[in-house]
Curated annotation (Swiss-Prot):
Cofactor note: Binds 2 magnesium ions per monomer.
Pfam family, one: Glycos_transf_3
Record organism: Prochlorococcus marinus (strain MIT 9301)
Domain of life: Bacteria
Keyword Cytoplasm: no
S-S pairs: none
Gene Ontology MF term list: anthranilate phosphoribosyltransferase activity; magnesium ion binding
Stated name of the protein: Anthranilate phosphoribosyltransferase
Cofactor(s) the protein needs: Mg(2+)
Residues that, per the record, bind Mg(2+) 2: D231, E232
Metabolic or biological pathway, per its Swiss-Prot or TrEMBL entry: Amino-acid biosynthesis; L-tryptophan biosynthesis; L-tryptophan from chorismate: step 2/5
Gene3D superfamilies reported for this sequence: Nucleoside phosphorylase/phosphoribosyltransferase catalytic domain, Transferase, Pyrimidine Nucleoside Phosphorylase, Chain C
Length: 344
């Protein structure tokens, strides 16, 4: 994959607001991976892409290059896999909803391959809270992959699988802005899931992320931007959705009031630190949590059940999720995964 354009020419196109085609987007990512772009150029590229806004073609093309260099140590399980990884970065400091969603969905029969990382901009990322709960993220990659067949859920810690991007981390941190790599994270799950629910922190990302998932061959997916700016479906009001199905994008909205529940402000979902995040996550999974916490998780699980093809009716999916939560099945699923990853 190559292009005759120099780094300077590609950068100039971006600065003039021109979108990159697939060939150029893939070539740009290859140059990053091959250390053919300096730190100064990287800062300029990331800033220019941010200012222009990345397209679905740019995102999916770069994601393909990242996936091409991500080799699996064992064969991918022949299962219909679903991911709940989003962009993060909404700055709302809510408890880690997508992680709770993953375990609840798994307890409802969805095969979950959860891709995640440490915090993007909030206080706690999925890896942070799972590490605090004692999940072993340093076991063999073979065991990580096999867990989805044995337990029905696994967690893929992004830095372990995408080591080529570690060298960019200090520069991204120095820039202090959200970049295209925040958007690429949810698109580069090494197990290449068949379906996904992908939360975005900005409404402007709904269409490009939906198009990217479509370009990557996703069977079914939902991109969601929550009321009040969450990168999850929110209890606060109208949530914007893009459904990906049959090769098409369909825009829609849902409100918790559609499920005969009252709207609740996002402030009720805020946590102050890692320990309180852990406490809330555990209480949701074992069925002893606050109603608002369990409801917001169930709402998002209903989207996962749709993506998995288990329940097309979101209201029914919501009730199915609450039933599983109230039985404490998600916590049992977490303990099974914890024990499996810790065993010799």
């Amino acid at each position: 994959m190559s292009t005759n354009l120099s780094n300077a020419e590609i950068l100039n196109n971006l600065l003039e607001g021109r979108d990159l085609d697939e060939l150029t987007s893939r070539a740009l990512m290859q140059r990053w991976l091959n250390d053919e772009i300096s730190d100064v150029e990287t800062g300029a590229f990331l800033s220019a892409l941010r200012a222009k806004s990345s397209t679905g073609v740019e995102l999916s093309s770069m994601a393909k290059e990242l996936l091409n260099v991500c080799e699996l140590p064992v064969a991918r399980p022949n299962l219909y896999l679903v991911d709940t990884c989003g962009t993060g970065g909404d700055g709302a400091n809510t408890f880690n909803i997508s992680t709770a969603v993953a375990f609840v969905a798994a307890s409802c029969g969805v095969k979950i391959a959860k891709h995640g990382n440490k915090s993007a901009s909030g206080k706690v990322g999925s890896a942070d809270v799972l590490l605090n709960l004692g999940l072993n993220l340093n076991c063999s990659l073979e065991k990580v992959i096999n867990a989805v067949s044995e337990i029905g859920i696994t967690f893929l810690f992004a830095p372990v699988w995408h080591k080529s991007l570690i060298k960019l981390a200090p520069l991204r941190k120095t820039l202090g802005i959200r970049t295209v790599f925040n958007q690429l994270g949810p698109l580069v799950n090494p197990l290449r899931p068949n379906a996904q629910v992908l939360g975005v922190a900005s409404e402007d990302l709904l269409q490009p992320m939906g198009s990217a998932l479509l370009n990557l061959g996703m069977n079914r997916a939902i991109v969601v931007h929550g009321s009040g700016g969450l990168d999850e479906a929110s209890l606060q009001g109208k949530n914007k959705l893009v459904f990906i199905e049959n090769g098409e994008l369909r825009f829609s909205e849902i409100n918790i009031s559609d499920f005969n529940h009252e709207n609740i402000a996002n402030e009720n979902l805020v946590v102050s630190d890692l320990d309180s995040n852990e406490e809330i996550l555990k209480s949701v999974l074992n069925g002893s949590g606050q109603k608002s916490h369990m409801d917001v998780v169930a709402l998002n699980v209903s989207l996962v059940l749709w993506a998995a093809g288990i329940e097309d009716n979101l209201n029914e999916g919501f009730n199915k999720a609450l039933f599983s939560i109230n039985k404490g099945d998600p916590w049992k699923k977490f303990l099974l995964l914890k024990n499996y990853l810790s065993a010799n």
